[in-house]
């Protein structure tokens, strides 16, 4: 589905202009303040709305608006069980860590999570270790965010002849940097997004990130609620959607090439992605654009999906399917491991699965994921940083209530919207991460307001951007503060720190951009892996460090190390040894659960095998509160 006019593009450009304007205003805001505190924490001045929306917008990343919708689209209603505990994670994160982190960060002057660990355990080594681990995992986490944004840009601009020509020219000019197997329109969209987000993050700092998070938080919830209304209307109501889904069978996934009887004419032949075509009585849909280059007779293999449900085939072909300018040749088709030929699998757990005969979400795994999101969300360093930047306990209490409501208004509607997407946009199962922008166009055009697609697309774009800017800034702050200032040049001037921060932010953006040149099929798997890894590495050391006086440096190192080793090993066995996309789950429990338990055990063993902390540290972290500190 592509735009039929420029109205959605104009709306999207206006949104982007507002984001850049906020960065410019923010840059002026911190010129007369301490650079590090303002650039990386906004001078610790977050109020209720700012705290709730920057916390929520950062948490609601590409996983919420690309990976999560793609899994709903692929597996159906079982995703409601999968995401359920995300509604309570703000209570866990803000309630358990918020007050203590705020007090301690002000006492110690800490700006980053490694800052807290260095002050608590009097260990520069631990701070460097945590910085390195955070930087690696967050750089990996950024790849899905960049991928989603590039897919949105491709969907928004892909029908423009100028955009198509520039994309092809870019790949011709930079063949060494851009893989020839990559879709040039995707690559061009990726570079446009990277330029936008890196420029405004570098220029505006934490305050720009918070201001844009507030804007993006409103855009996200408004976009989701509008999509919910349009989706329910266009499928004829939830009862009708449920009845249709109960009759659906999972599709079959395969590849195809397209041939000509004679060489292609000048400029070649292009068949758009999402094009329907028939081979005999079988119905297929392309999931990638087809290019037959000038002077050639055959395209490269592209992904196609075969529709298997009889009523879907009848409905789609009722008005006829257009003839293709080339002949399709199907190379292979793969049935689902669970659900192939079965009706109703989208309506009940464990849901259909292309690779797992047990389905997507067996009961034990559903229980495991209820613990997963509460732990993973609480253990994210990006959330901890925001808990170091609010104004007082009253702000924290109100933000918790606001954020729980905010997540309810996003995640449950998303389940409904993208179950409806199986009826409104069938046949995208090979590239399900594109379902969000595709649905934005389908719903806005179906509602007779095509310009609204630009606003609806801004919701997932905002989710990716709000996560990217926060994570880039957090990596940059840890590198500048914990590596450069603390270990290399303690007497660095404000000017030097500013330019080192700018350069680091730019470098991180470049790394994530190159990583996104090879996008995975399911973004959510990367997000789950890296999000879980961050929680395993940081939740136990930080929580034990701020609440347990006996906890010491050896305990923190063993906690972090043993947790990550166990967590990574379970993924390694699944990914490499068993050649499976999913990790090994002993007793049906996710690796995060085992990693977190190992982290707690490692922390306990390391603590009691070595000595206690210094009196100075105990006084600083567990003594009387500062007279001016609001902890009421």
Regions inferred by a protein language model and the residue ranges of each:
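Membrane-embedded helix-loop-helix hairpins and adjacent transmembrane boundary segments
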Residues: 1-632
């Amino acid at each position: 589905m592509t735009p039929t006019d420029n109205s959605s593009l104009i709306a999207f450009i206006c949104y982007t202009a507002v984001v850049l304007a906020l960065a410019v205003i923010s840059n002026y805001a911190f010129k007369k303040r301490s650079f590090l505190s303002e650039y990386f924490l906004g001078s610790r001045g977050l109020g209720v709305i700012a705290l709730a929306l920057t916390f929520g917008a950062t948490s609601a990343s590409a996983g919420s608006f690309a990976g999560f919708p793609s899994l709903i689209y692929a597996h159906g209603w079982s995703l409601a069980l999968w995401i359920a505990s995300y509604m309570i994670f703000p209570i866990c994160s803000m309630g358990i860590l918020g007050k203590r982190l705020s007090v301690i960060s002000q006492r110690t002057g800490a700006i980053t999570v490694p800052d807290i660990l260095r002050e608590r355990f009097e260990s520069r080594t631990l701070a460097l270790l945590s910085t390195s681990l955070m930087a690696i995992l967050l750089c990996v986490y950024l790849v899905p965010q960049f991928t989603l944004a590039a897919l949105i840009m491709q969907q928004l601009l892909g029908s423009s002849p100028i955009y198509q020509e520039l994309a092809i020219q870019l790949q011709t000019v930079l063949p060494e940097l851009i893989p020839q197997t990559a879709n040039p329109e995707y690559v061009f969209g990726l570079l446009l997004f990277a330029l936008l987000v890196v420029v405004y993050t570098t220029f505006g700092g934490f305050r720009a990130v918070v201001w844009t998070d507030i804007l993006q938080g409103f855009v996200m919830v408004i976009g989701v609620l509008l999509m919910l209304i349009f989706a329910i209307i266009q499928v004829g109501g939830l009862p009708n959607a449920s009845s249709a889904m109960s009759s659906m069978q999972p599709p079959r996934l395969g590849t195809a090439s397209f041939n000509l009887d004679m060489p292609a004419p000048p400029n070649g032949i292009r068949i758009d992605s999402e094009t329907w075509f028939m081979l005999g009585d079988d119905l297929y849909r392309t999931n990638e654009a087809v290019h037959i280059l000038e002077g050639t007779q055959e395209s490269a293999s592209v992904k196609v999906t075969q529709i298997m449900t009889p009523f879907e085939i009848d409905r789609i072909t009722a008005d006829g399917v257009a003839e293709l300018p080339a002949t399709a040749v199907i190379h292979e088709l793969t049935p689902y491991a669970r659900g192939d030929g079965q009706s109703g699998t989208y309506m009940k757990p464990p849901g259909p699965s292309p690779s797992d005969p047990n389905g997507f979400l067996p009961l034990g795994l559903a229980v495991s994921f209820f613990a997963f999101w509460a732990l993973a969300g609480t253990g994210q360093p990006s959330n901890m940083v925001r808990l170091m930047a609010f104004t007082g306990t009253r702000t924290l209490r109100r933000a918790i209530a606001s954020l729980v409501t905010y997540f309810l208004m996003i995640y449950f509607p998303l389940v409904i919207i993208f179950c409806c997407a199986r009826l409104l946009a069938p046949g995208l199962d090979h590239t399900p991460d594109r379902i969000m922008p595709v649905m934005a166009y389908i719903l806005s055009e179906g509602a007779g307001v095509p310009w609204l697609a630009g606003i609806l697309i801004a919701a997932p774009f905002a989710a990716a951007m709000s996560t990217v800017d926060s994570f880039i800034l957090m990596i940059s702050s840890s590198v500048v503060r914990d590596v450069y200032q603390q270990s290399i040049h303690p007497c660095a001037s404000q000017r030097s720190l500013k330019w080192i921060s700018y350069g680091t932010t730019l470098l991180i953006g470049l790394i994530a951009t190159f990583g996104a040149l090879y996008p995975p099929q399911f973004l959510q798997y990367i997000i789950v892996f890296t999000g879980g890894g961050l929680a395993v590495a940081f939740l136990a050391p930080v929580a034990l460090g701020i609440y347990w006086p006996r906890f010491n440096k050896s305990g923190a190192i063993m906690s972090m190390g043993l947790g990550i080793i166990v967590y990574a090993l379970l993924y390694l066995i699944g990914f490499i040894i068993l050649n499976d996309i999913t990790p090994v789950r002993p007793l049906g429990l996710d690796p995060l659960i085992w990693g977190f338990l190992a982290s707690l055990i490692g922390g306990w063993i390391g603590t009691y095998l070595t000595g206690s902390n210094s009196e100075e540290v105990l006084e600083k972290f567990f003594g009387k509160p500062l007279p001016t500190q609001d902890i009421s």
